[in-house]
Design a protein with these regions (language model features):
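The substrate-binding groove and active-site-proximal loops of carbohydrate-active enzymes
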Residues: 23-34, 57-72, 130-150, 254-272, ...
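Short acidic, Pro/Gly- and aromatic-enriched capping/linker segments at domain boundaries
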Residues: 1-14, 198-205, 597-613
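Hydrophobic targeting/anchoring helices
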Residues: 287, 292-471, 555-589, 600-615, ...
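N-terminal carbohydrate-binding accessory modules
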Residues: 1-47, 437
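A short, well-structured beta->alpha microelement
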Residues: 38, 312-315, 475-495
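Polysaccharide-binding and catalytic clefts of secreted carbohydrate-active enzymes
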Residues: 105-321, 327-330, 338, 344
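A conserved amphipathic helix/loop scaffold
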Residues: 387-388, 506-731
Length: 731
């Protein structure tokens, strides 16, 4: 049996196959569609001919007894197809363990109440509509879970014991929920599951959370007549489908605790399912097969707790999970983009887990046309030259951050059926392989921190926290700074201590022991900490202890919200901040009353008009900044970075990722560009095969979408890496 592991080397997660450190570059061929398997087989063959020997296939695992053998047969067919063309192939098996369609409907017949049900399917009398439309078994069903775990164990055991296939499967990618990605099925369109199975799960969750203590339950919920058997999902659900209105931003009242506990369940249930399936794979394979899953899409999903993706810390700390995955961020991925990650990527690396980038960037190739084909809305690459520049950008990012990737023909259409594409991928794979022993972890000077447990208390992220997460992420990627993304727990644990500037996206939970831990980070010498929007239910003393400033709340009149709009003042007068002027309404607003060093901006409208919404406090060797809006734009972020003394590596707007040994750059707009290095050093311009000796910057005039990989340090040491000479782009 082949053995595969993810292990740290120089602090970086590395893929080992049979004890050989291997560049983690895969090709995913979509094996879901029988009528396109001939295309996928051609792509497998072409990839192997160009030196790619890591592959991924996909299938739906049937959990019912009568479905199990067909699932085994399907994977066997896919492996046979692949091994015909590459006897050395090593395979990542992507397998969906959930139950859909006819299988789910059949399950419902014997297990009523275990299909996903949406809030809109509930009648006024509390009963489910007879004609409710659902196509998935609820992930809250315990009977389904047990059956799926048994099926997965039998499935994995078959291939572990197979005389041929056991030598080729190196990883299982456990998928479920919507599109394998562990979102709650249809949550963006229909909302969250309120089925009988979900109701039962919530009662069990609440009982466990409060230790079965009725007194604790009643104190938390503010009801002295409440018992555990009375617990049910409270409807309407704040933020369901992302847009349900709710009078306040933060859920802090006793009568709102049921919503908080339900939001928590939505994520912890998904995490616990993944952990259970991962444990099975590790046990059956004796720990010698890699396990990964889709999870942690905090930024792409706009901070929405209804997604189920906010129990990431549980999975980061799970010894049975080796890695995580997501597609490249969809909204900034093409030529001139940054290819942003959806997750707290630097926490992943800090836990020595590997992030697998699903590189499903659409190419301009199709093997054959089909009825109904239209231009893909996410496609923006129409020639080899542009495609290569994006591939080089992605490869550089992955090398610096220790990530794996699979190049993905999402639907088996022949996106990769051209030898020139495989030549390029093979050259990048050889480069990655040569750098593996030499790269050390990325060292951010700016830390972006999100507390996932506090996301459970956000009534609706749409139009508020979504700006903080989704929008600001893309701005952070374009600042020309060394920016890292972390979980709140990892920040408190010291995993972001290299940063001199920290953005706390939702500091509402920094109370008690957590607050004391935060103070140790905030009060470090040379540290600047930025608090975004507000402080939940903290009192004045708690807010002042964190920030050094006196802050207060401005509550909106009943049935209304307050607009977040500011005008700049003092030394910042005249600044133009489009983001702060965005039409965002929220309740409450927070403002600074006193004990500040400098005010930067004041609110301009409504009850908060004239009150300070943006200010700084210089303290004994450190400084704090409060910003009462939800999104800081590029100019303000750079102003703050300069106040903090953060090193700037280049022009704002371009993508620049500066690692300890190498830097990747990709231009957003044409023009003269200067990149700065952390010190005077020798620089190898890899794609140009050119050396610059003893420099601290390089200036070039460039077109849009040009990628450069700079490797820096001592020329003698870098030449000792024995890097393959870049042969130039194939076409």
């Amino acid at each position: 049996m082949v053995k595969a592991h993810v292990r740290p080397v120089n602090g970086m997660p590395r893929l080992f196959i049979d004890e050989q450190m291997t560049a983690p570059v895969f090709f995913y061929g979509c094996t879901l569609f029988e009528h396109r398997l001939d295309i996928v087989e051609r792509e497998f063959k072409m990839a192997a001919q160009h030196g790619i020997h890591l592959f991924s296939v996909i299938l739906k695992m049937g959990a019912m007894p009568e479905e199990r053998q067909p699932s085994i047969d399907n994977l066997s067919r896919y492996l046979d197809m692949l091994l015909r063309h590459d006897p050395a192939a090593k395979v990542l098996v992507r397998i969906n363990v959930c139950q859909y369609g006819s299988s789910a409907r059949k399950w419902e017949e014997s297990h009523p109440g275990e299909m996903v049900v949406y809030e809109a399917d509930i009648q006024d009398d509390g009963e489910v509509k007879a004609d409710f439309d659902s196509t998935m078994t609820s992930v809250f069903s315990e009977d389904w879970r047990k059956m799926a775990e048994e099926a997965l164990e039998a499935f994995v055991r078959y291939f572990v014991e197979h005389p041929v296939y056991a030598d080729h499967i190196v990883a299982y990618h456990i998928g479920g929920g919507e599109s394998d990605e562990w979102f709650h099925f249809g949550y963006r369109e229909g909302g969250c599951d309120v089925s009988a199975a979900a109701q039962k799960a919530l009662r069990a969750h609440v009982q466990a959370k409060y230790g079965g203590d009725v007194a604790r339950l009643r104190a938390a919920y503010g009801r002295d007549d409440l018992n555990f058997e009375d617990i049910s999902i409270a409807m309407p659900i704040p933020g369901n489908t992302g847009r349900n209105p709710y009078p306040t931003y933060y859920l802090s009242k006793p009568e709102e605790q049921i919503h908080v506990d339900y939001n928590e369940l939505l994520s912890t249930r998904i995490a616990d399912l993944i952990k259970g399936f991962a444990r099975i794979v590790k046990r059956v394979t004796n720990g010698d097969t890699i396990v990964l899953c889709f999870y942690g899409y905090w930024y792409e999903l706009g901070g929405d707790s209804k997604s189920g993706h906010f129990a990431f810390q549980r999975l980061l700390e799970c010894p049975d999970i080796d890695g995580f995955s997501s597609p490249i961020g969809y909204w900034d991925r093409d030529l001139g983009g940054t290819g942003p990650y959806m997750c707290a990527i630097d926490s992943v690396v800090a836990h020595h887990k590997m992030w697998f980038v699903e590189n499903d960037i659409r190419t301009f190739l199709l093997y054959r046309r089909e009825p109904g084909d239209t231009r893909d809305g996410f496609q923006n690459l129409y020639n080899f030259e542009d495609l290569y520049e994006v591939y080089k950008r992605e490869a550089g990012t992955q090398m610096i951050r220790g990530c794996a990737s699979w190049y993905m023909d999402l639907a088996g259409r022949g996106w990769f059926y051209h030898p020139a594409i495989w030549e390029q991928i093979h050259h990048l794979e050889r480069l990655y392989d040569a750098t593996l022993p030499h790269i050390t972890p990325f060292v951010p000077e700016v830390a972006v921190v999100l507390d996932e447990e506090e996301v459970y208390r956000i009534a609706s992220a749409h139009g508020t926290f979504g700006y903080t997460t989704f929008n600001m992420r893309m701005t952070f990627y374009r600042l020309g700074l060394a920016v890292g993304f972390y979980t709140g727990d990892d920040w408190l644990a010291g995993k972001a201590d290299s940063a001199k500037l920290t953005f706390l996206l939702n500091p509402t939970g920094l109370k008690g022991a957590k607050g004391e831990g935060a103070l140790e980070k905030i009060r470090r010498q040379g540290q600047t900490t930025v608090f975004i929007y507000g402080f939940g239910d903290m009192d004045t003393a708690q807010m002042q202890r964190l920030t050094g400033m006196t802050l207060a709340r401005c509550e909106a009149p009943a049935g209304t919200k307050l607009p977040v709009q500011m005008v700049f003042c003092g030394s910042w007068e005249g600044c133009k901040n489009v983001s702060a002027g965005r039409e965002v309404d929220v309740n409450p607003l927070f403002y600074v009353q006193g004990d500040y060093t400098e005010a930067f901006a004041q609110y301009t409208i409504g009850e908060a008009a004239g009150k300070i919404g943006f200010a700084m406090k210089r303290q004994d060797g450190y400084q704090t900044i409060f910003f009462g809006g939800f999104e800081l734009d590029r100019d303000l972020l750079l102003r703050i970075a300069r106040l903090a003394g953060v090193r700037e590596y280049g022009y704002f707007g371009d993508y620049i990722l500066p690692g300890p040994q190498m830097m990747i750059t990709h231009t957003t707009e044409p023009g003269e560009k200067t990149v700065h290095f952390p010190r005077v050093c020798d620089v190898y311009d890899y794609y140009e095969n050119r050396w610059y000796e003893q420099v601290d910057r390089i200036t070039k005039t460039l077109d849009k979408g040009k990628t450069f990989l700079y490797i820096y340090g001592s020329r003698r040491e870098i030449e000792g890496w024995n890097l393959p000479v870049w042969p130039g782009d194939p076409i």
